[in-house]
Amino acid sequence: MNYRELIKSGADPTDIQRFLADGEMTAITIRIPKNLRDSAKEAAELRGMSFSALVRAGLIQQLMKRD
């Protein structure tokens, strides 16, 4: 099952979050402004998490929204 099928099936938020957090890690490259990256790194440190964890959390939060 993929993300689209999960949403169309009316899966509950816990199942969606579990699906998004599971799977093997893969490396990606994104281009963002340096100020955005530096600010996000600082924010992550203040929250006791890594930059990567902050990005993953933000992506999961956006994908959990039901528009």
What is each stretch, according to the model?
Residues 1-27, 34-35:
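A detector of short terminal or domain-flanking linear segments
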Residues 22-53:
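Short, contiguous, helix-prone interaction/anchoring segments in small proteins
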Residues 49-67:
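Short, basic amphipathic alpha-helical segments that act as recognition/interaction helices
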Residues 6, 41, 64-67:
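Short, positively charged interaction helices/loops
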Residues 1-5, 45, 56-57:
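Charged, low-complexity intrinsically disordered terminal regions and linker tails
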